[in-house]
């Protein structure tokens, strides 16, 4: 609800950045953003464990647009998924109590990400398998 005299001005956001770099978040993702932030010297910082659900949402949105036949740069799809795989494999993650909508999106991402052991090796991640990544993401977010 806008205050008296307030106006909305539509702005164009380049399609390649709109999925992750959203200006407006729905209530569930805004709640997740607040839950996952630390304030350091007056700056809000999103902890890395909480960045993963946002990257998963970006991947899901891009993947859905791709399925509908819209132009999606496949490098963006690959980047979001590979970033999540690297973070899960290389960082110590905290258990995140996600809002239900975000948790549902994470479950969809885990189900749809289709990572293989060969892709893990291609990322030069040693001592980790695709199933390890799926299990870790499930344990941390679901």
Predicted regions and their residues:
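Compositionally biased terminal segments of proteins
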Residues: 1-142
